[in-house]
Amino acid sequence: MQNLAPASEGQRLRRILDANLDRAREGLRVIEEWCRFGREDAALSAECKDLRQTLGRYHTEELRAARQTDQDPGTALSHPQERDRPTLNAVLTANFARVQEALRVIEEYGKLTDTELSETAKALRYRVYILEQALTLNPLQARLRQLQGAKLYLVTAPSDRLLEIVEAALKGGLPLVQYRDKTSDDHTRLTTARQLQALCQRYGALFLVNDRVDIALGANADGVHLGQMDIPMELARQILGRDRLVGRSTTNAQELERAIAEGADYVGVGPIFATPTKPGKAAVGFDYLQYARKHAPMPQFAIGGIDLSNIEEVIKAGATQVAVVRAIMAAADPEATTRELLRRLSQGEPS
């Protein structure tokens, strides 16, 4: 290898970004070919193409000019597993890992050179996780896995800025949205639900509809959330299909036992504090939260009056997953508030 003068730090960073943009785009192309020709799935193919093209916009001539393939000591390195791909699943798994690792590298090194690229890589990485689940798991398994990992859950409230607020929260990392609207006409609800579903899909978040199984079906939602006075869960599954999520609100041990017997995919636990979202409902406090933590086999989302001023109390009481309404819907900066709520929930995780 020819001895060259040491490259500047900026030059080295550009080489790292160039190499990993190449790696991510190549891996996505391999995955896209199977989505297109193997699965013949137009939606998954379009998602792969959008991911590739989004990365391509950041793969500038400046980054390409930093490339020094003949001086790269890594080009001669290989591993036996790279030469052995015995099954289709092995090919897909290897290329998903390749893309995810490359995006993480871009995210971290992009913080030093291009914060927009870094944030984009982070968002794309989560979309790739969803894509992998769609290809390697059945739809219900994929949704359940995503639900299990969702720390924060936004239940919407009517607002003239609804889409703007929800998108800001999604940019902040929100993994789960429930559309709740008790007053609008059905045409408005369906139109809004479809807009929210498209937003959630773009950011790789789950989307549920409150109460209305028909709206959930019409909007292609990931599932529905039922209250105690709504239709039986089995009927909801018959209408929606067995691959969708169904959650249930609970306020006491008897309601929790019913939800467990029905096979709820998750439960809401609350209201922890008094809240105008549920007027006339007495706060259940932390005793029921701790009971649910001990007895419920499915994810439990603490809900009711939770915000930045009291979330640490809720975490100390045992909650690991939290649902909020006003904390985000009424926030001056929904994106920053979402990030802070997620940060505190992450800090509260058991080590």
UniProtKB/Swiss-Prot annotation:
Catalytic activity: 2-[(2R,5Z)-2-carboxy-4-methylthiazol-5(2H)-ylidene]ethyl phosphate + 4-amino-2-methyl-5-(diphosphooxymethyl)pyrimidine + 2 H(+) = thiamine phosphate + CO2 + diphosphate; 2-(2-carboxy-4-methylthiazol-5-yl)ethyl phosphate + 4-amino-2-methyl-5-(diphosphooxymethyl)pyrimidine + 2 H(+) = thiamine phosphate + CO2 + diphosphate; 4-methyl-5-(2-phosphooxyethyl)-thiazole + 4-amino-2-methyl-5-(diphosphooxymethyl)pyrimidine + H(+) = thiamine phosphate + diphosphate
Pfam families linked to this entry: ThiD2, TMP-TENI
Keyword Metal-binding: yes
Binding site for 2-[(2R,5Z)-2-carboxy-4-methylthiazol-5(2H)-ylidene]ethyl phosphate: T275, P276, T277, G305
Cofactor binding note: Binds 1 Mg(2+) ion per subunit.
Pathway linked to the protein: Cofactor biosynthesis; thiamine diphosphate biosynthesis; thiamine phosphate from 4-amino-2-methyl-5-diphosphomethylpyrimidine and 4-methyl-5-(2-phosphoethyl)-thiazole: step 1/1
Coiled coil: none
GO MF assignments: magnesium ion binding; thiamine-phosphate diphosphorylase activity
PANTHER family for this protein: THIAMINE-PHOSPHATE PYROPHOSPHORYLASE (PTHR20857), THIAMINE-PHOSPHATE SYNTHASE (PTHR20857:SF15)
Function field: Condenses 4-methyl-5-(beta-hydroxyethyl)thiazole monophosphate (THZ-P) and 2-methyl-4-amino-5-hydroxymethyl pyrimidine pyrophosphate (HMP-PP) to form thiamine monophosphate (TMP).
Protein name: Thiamine-phosphate synthase
Provenance organism: Thermosynechococcus vestitus (strain NIES-2133 / IAM M-273 / BP-1)
Taxon lineage: Bacteria, Bacillati, Cyanobacteriota, Cyanophyceae, Acaryochloridales
